[in-house]
Amino acid sequence: MKPEPQSEAELMERAQDIAGLSFAELAEEAGMTVPENLKRDKGWVGQLLEWHLGAPAGSKPQQDFAKLGIELKSIPIGYSGKPLETTFVSVAPLTGVQGLTWETSHVRNKLSRVLWVPVEGEREIPLAERRVGSPLIWSPDQEEEQILKNDWEELMELIVLGKFDQISARHGEALHLRPKAANAKALTEAYSSNGKPIKTLPRGFYLRTQFTEQILLKHYINAQSE
């Protein structure tokens, strides 16, 4: 793996250096094998980018580049230039949630500064031939932060009240909560609405594609006008 970048500028330079290259080219340099598809290797693209950008390994509560305070997110893009899937942010806490605030939450920490790396995501393009796009660095503006905070507080209130059955994909304008488990048997501890311990599927916070699309649009419109 490449050494950890020492500044945001160095990280951006590395991300710009791999823009336009195919997964096959990047995998060859990293000594990695390109899987046939991502069904069993969902995290493969992220691992490939981490190798080239010098991100310390492992999925941790802090950001990928903790020293720089930056989170790395790859984002699969379709022919239309729009994101093809929601973006995982962090696992939702289901116990010990009393007194948690947006300001100290993992979600806010992860989204405070993000290096977005768009990648070709159309399924008909063989994985090896897909290319990395032009990177962008982003922090939520005041309006975006308020939307994220409102969503997080609404969803956490339902968790605190044990209303798991009432949480649906409709909740949240930018952020939504959905089960995150490889299979339906991977249950975790939580509390029901009457305060009794229960087992339920782990949940994860995800950014909606409409929200990430707006981030990309704003950035590329600004870049063109500069």
From Swiss-Prot:
GO terms for biological process: DNA modification; mismatch repair. Keywords: Cytoplasm, DNA damage, DNA repair, Endonuclease, Hydrolase, Nuclease. Gene3D superfamilies: DNA mismatch repair MutH/Restriction endonuclease, type II. Signal peptide: none annotated. It holds the Pfam family MutH. GO terms for molecular function: DNA binding; endonuclease activity. InterPro entries: DNA_mismatch_repair_MutH (IPR004230), DNA_rep_MutH/RE_typeII_Sau3AI (IPR011337), DNA_rep_MutH/T2_RE_sf (IPR037057), Restrct_endonuc-II-like (IPR011335). SUPFAM superfamilies: Restriction endonuclease-like. It is found in: Cytoplasm. Its main location: cytoplasm. GO terms for cellular component: cytoplasm. Sequence-specific endonuclease that cleaves unmethylated GATC sequences. It is involved in DNA mismatch repair. Belongs to the MutH family. HAMAP family: MutH. This is DNA mismatch repair protein MutH. It comes from Vibrio campbellii (strain ATCC BAA-1116).
